[in-house]
Amino acid sequence: MNNIIVERLSLLREVMRREKLSAFIFPSTDAHNGEYVPDHWKSREWVSGFNGSAGTVVVTQNEAALWTDSRYFIAAEEQLQGTGIVLMKLKMPGTPTIPEWLGRKLVCIDSPEVGVDGMVNSINTVEALRFELRRQGGITLRTNFDPLRDIWTDRPAIPQNPVEIHPVEYAGVDTAEKLVQIRKSLARQHADGMLVSSLDDIAWILNLRGSDVHCNPVFVSYLLIGPVTATLYINKVKLQNGVEEYLCKHGINIDDYQNVKSGVKKYEGFSLLLDPEETSYSVFKAVGNVDVVCQTSPVPYMKAVKNDAEIKGYRSAMLKDGIAMVKFLKWLKPAVEAGGQTEMSVDRKLTALRAEQPLFRDISFDTIAGYADHGAIVHYEATPETDRELEPHGLLLLDSGAQYQDGTTDITRTIALGPVSEEEKHVYTLVLKGHIQIELCKFLKGAAGTQIDVLAREAMWRDGMNYLHGTGHGVGSYLNVHEGPHQIRMEWKSTPFVEGMTVTDEPGLYLAGRFGVRIENTLVVEKYKETEFGEFLKFDSLTLCPIDTVPIDKSMLLQEEIDWLNDYHARVYRELAPHLNDEEKVWLKDATLPI
């Protein structure tokens, strides 16, 4: 594989020489600035061989480098071996920014020009990059060229999978009402309309789902919302089984996907909101004389606050997922003791058990099944080359989820496959303490995730330990497993929590070369109480699955943490047991015994 990457870099550099480009930058994003992208837009992976969900590759005539975050440090080092591409560890001391690195590498070149594909870079990304490159000795930026157009000869086509209607019984609110609320918000933002580029936003607005992106039920399109009408830019072949009639009934015009730039130009004389974080720079440059309002889209926030039907759907999906998880956990240890089970085989087993549940559609992301030292690779994905046989000792980190038609799930359990060391118990209990403190949290309405994040880390910090990923992210309703704008993380995020938001609680600790621990539930924000000091909120766990008590050092837990765990396990048994057979009930009863 790495010889292929060297050949691809050579072809790329020939194109760059012909175009007089000193460097080219490949991000992870697509034309819709999504986190997960169709294969057609996986340019960075094609160039570098690195398949993580986040990262940027920069190629000059003589060097190349990949910038990625702590989730992928270990995986990136392995995947980049032999390619000549250097790993740049984001947010680590001594790591230069991309403009700083380019400033050093291009210092001896007269009038250096750096290229990016404006279709897969947002307005904000391009403008910020242009500003920073100017500061590095006047490096200019070209945005109208895709260097892989002629050399990526087997490039996958843009997917054309059919779209399906998402019933309002699961969506809770119909498309007409959503458009009314969006237009009201646009009026407050002094805009007559907006272009929606984000695929999960479009799916949510229209109550449609697709399968164009692996594990994410979305479809490639743009949605242009005007003062009265709206137009969906999509390949018509995707509109089958009454979907075109459904759109017409809701007043949605249909045009070809490739016509979005000309469609935007028709709004001359109107003000059009373009979210600078989501809208492609090339689309922005095509608007002509349209009055552009560069502001944050109102849709992600609307989508993040779940209605009663969506929350009901989550609870139903989590029940089904909990049943599948219990069946899996009951099977796991005897299967490992019998021999022959690997990281990939347990992934297949869990997916098969989920697929038996009603309304199952897909997994919600590629399962992370990391045994022993593989558990320390935050976003590890087993391959035939790395797949490891499980042994009846040590820890298995299992991060997985499913797409059910009534909800999306995301759960992590770290499981003792047999005897564990005192160090493993200590680290496991630190992570559990952080997880429970988020679950127990009561907070003033208006608080954001940044103000809550420390609760997950405080016990770890006392031990001089930390993790570098976020503590929690929003979860879609039969949509993307990662959703915003709210998060729980150290870095400042100003979006406050409100009732109806879902968020994960997933602290972890990772000891490179040894083992990793992460424990994750999905939570929903609920009202706690109102006093003379204001309104207070709390979290309620949607996830129903036992947390392994074998690796716990009980002496490290506070009484309130013990009480929470015992209460949670009593609830897990109470809600799941009626749906299990007698053997499964016996196993679950034992797994949820008070500690």
PLM features per residue range, with description:
Residues 1-595:
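Active-site neighborhoods and metal-handling regions in enzymes and metal-associated proteins
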